């Protein structure tokens, strides 16, 4: 019994010794791992996934990239931006350079705020001296922004001039040959040293840029405003030779072309005259509309697209509608007073009859979602009518007597409730622009119910088919009855329920059969 106890005790002692040994091993491994992590922090490059970053070949990896090449050729600031973009691409980050200066400024503010929060968390949790340093070596006022833990932040500020000098020398070594030749004839279009397309320049930027451009174009130190002898031959005839900081055109000219668009025309004319149109459009994506033609029916099918338009108030009181993305001016409105919230010209659908068979051929033209905050109601209706007419003109000509179903999404605008005759006139203009003689307009939903109530046929689920010549009369009647006006689209199989007579014109009340 005693021998068994001794044996068991020895066995337990062996197990305990093994456990202690295992614990020691775990402690050793943990210590080694922690030491390895610290060593990795000390020795690793700025991106731990990569090898030590070699800036001797900084632009070769992106030499074929048009954005980087364009930046590198724009001077020291552009070269610094190109090197930064190349660094991010070498590390396979999924981001791209933002070519729009306004959007780039917003992104800069957002990301700097995010960096500050991350840096504060890092210094507090980890307990290390860390900073964020942002530099743009432009002259004479370079951007040097540093924030982070003290006293490291103050130490870096102390060596600002040395850091800037070393950075400029390093960038000069990588600058492409002949990078400064662009400014020998005309200055490149740049905002804060970064190239920009002329269509993305704001009015304030254009007003500040044009006098500098004139120095290069005319060779004079001052433009000589008001002196016809100093006026360049490329200056637009419809723009007075006067200081561009104010618009002195006639009211008619202001109504026709916005001041921002006129300033862009000045810049374009100058660069075209000097044969440097290549400098006008930096990073511009050439977007072409793809049109597929069906051989059997010869019907043009336009790929649906959504055009977003933003408003810009001009100093002369006009409001320009600028297409987001391209910067092109869609329309210029005369006054900046009341205008409803959102206008969308949505779809134009039509069906034709060929050899006794009904075929549905769709031309979807989703053109121009406009968020408009200020203008007159009459301007709104004219803008909608113009957009719709342009959309219809883009589609194939329709046969006489074809049935068209149209929609003006969200064009209730409290429709006839608020604007009455103006709204009715705009929609009637759309109808007349779309249909040839003998065509029909199909109303649905609430509008159909309203027309049904007017004609004594209260069928809220049906469609109302109205001749083009009578459409404005019907819509005006709805407006006077405080009904929202909407022209609905949905060419589907219908069943005629009733035929009414309205002012001598036949009005058919039909019901959907889906």
From Swiss-Prot:
It comes from Danio rerio (Zebrafish). Homodimer. Binds DNA as a dimer. Residues 38-61 are annotated as: Disordered. It is found in: Nucleus. It holds the Pfam family Nrf1_DNA-bind. Residues 109-307 bind DNA. Residues 303-488 are annotated as: Required for transcriptional activation. GO terms for molecular function: DNA-binding transcription factor activity, RNA polymerase II-specific; protein homodimerization activity; RNA polymerase II cis-regulatory region sequence-specific DNA binding. This is Nuclear respiratory factor 1. A motif (Nuclear localization signal) lies at residues 88-116. GO terms for biological process: cellular response to cold; neural retina development; photoreceptor cell maintenance; regulation of transcription by RNA polymerase II; response to activity; retina development in camera-type eye; retina homeostasis. Residues 40-57 have a biased composition (Acidic residues). Probable transcription factor that is required for normal development of the outer retina. Residues 1-78 are annotated as: Dimerization. Disulfide bonds: none annotated. Belongs to the NRF1/Ewg family. The gene is nrf1. InterPro entries: NRF1/Ewg, Nrf1_NLS/DNA-bd_dimer. GO terms for cellular component: nucleus.
